[in-house]
Curated annotation (Swiss-Prot):
Pathway: Purine metabolism; GMP biosynthesis; GMP from XMP (L-Gln route): step 1/1. It catalyses: XMP + L-glutamine + ATP + H2O = GMP + L-glutamate + AMP + diphosphate + 2 H(+). Residues 5-189 form the Glutamine amidotransferase type-1 domain. GO terms for cellular component: cytosol. This is GMP synthase [glutamine-hydrolyzing] subunit A. It comes from Methanococcoides burtonii (strain DSM 6242 / NBRC 107633 / OCM 468 / ACE-M). The active site is at 79 (nucleophile), 166, 168. Catalyzes the synthesis of GMP from XMP. The lineage of its organism: Archaea, Methanobacteriati, Methanobacteriota, Stenosarchaea group, Methanomicrobia. Heterodimer composed of a glutamine amidotransferase subunit (A) and a GMP-binding subunit (B). PANTHER family: GMP SYNTHASE [GLUTAMINE-HYDROLYZING], GMP SYNTHASE-RELATED. InterPro entries: Class_I_gatase-like, GATASE, GMP_synth_GATase, GMP_synthase_A. Its EC number is 6.3.5.2. One of its GO terms (molecular function) is ATP binding. Coiled coil: none annotated.
Length: 189
């Protein structure tokens, strides 16, 4: 695979730098940018893909909704990024049944581009303080768990994906595979 330019949007989550390091260690050109960066400045970077990091609250997502609505390249939302994507397209989020971080067994419902090779079950590290509770109309449900019905999703037409879990942490099995699957989507787009 050729080297791609992946922009990591900093939503002030504790694992943002781990996302950046993982992407870099997988031989991609990567840069962390503030979530207040203009769409124009992001496009000036000529990225092949965008990753929306996790973060503490929806009130601190800056311009992320504008990125999702107006930038036509592959986007992967992680945790809060996943929730933001859902809200942007009319889905709902709410408090999860299991707050805090824990190892979760995820069932892959549909092994699409982003979850290729991860199913039928995979162990992940996730926080469920908040989660997607209602899937947006234009999205396909990809994965679930006993503590969260919507662990992963993707847009029906656009290359927009969301996962509730953290593929960048060592506690997640096959996290690098998920990133490589996303890079393949970026390369093919």
């Amino acid at each position: 695979m050729k080297e791609l330019k992946i922009i990591v949007i900093n939503n002030y989550g504790q694992f943002c730098h781990l996302i950046h390091r993982t992407v870099r260690d997988l031989d991609m050109d990567t840069k962390i940018v503030a979530n207040t960066t203009s769409v124009e400045d992001i496009l000036d970077e000529e990225p092949d893909g965008i990753i929306l990091s996790g973060g503490p609250s929806m009130e601190r997502v800056g311009s992320c909704q504008e990125y999702v609505e107006s930038i036509d390249i592959p986007i992967l939302g992680i945790c809060l990024g996943h929730q933001l994507i859902a809200q942007t397209f009319g889905g709902h989020t709410g408090a999860g049944k299991l707050g805090g971080y824990a190892a979760i067994d995820v069932e892959v419902i549909e092994e699409d581009d982003i979850l290729k090779g991860l199913g039928p079950r995979t162990s992940v590290w996730a926080s469920h303080a908040d989660e997607v509770t209602v899937l947006p109309d234009e999205f396909i449900h990809l994965a679930r768990s006993d503590v969260c019905e919507i662990e992963a999703m993707r847009h029906e037409e656009r290359p927009i994906y969301g996962v509730q879990w953290h593929p960048e942490v060592a506690h997640t099995d096959k996290g690098e595979e998920l990133f490589m699957n996303f890079f393949k989507v970026c390369e093919d787009y």
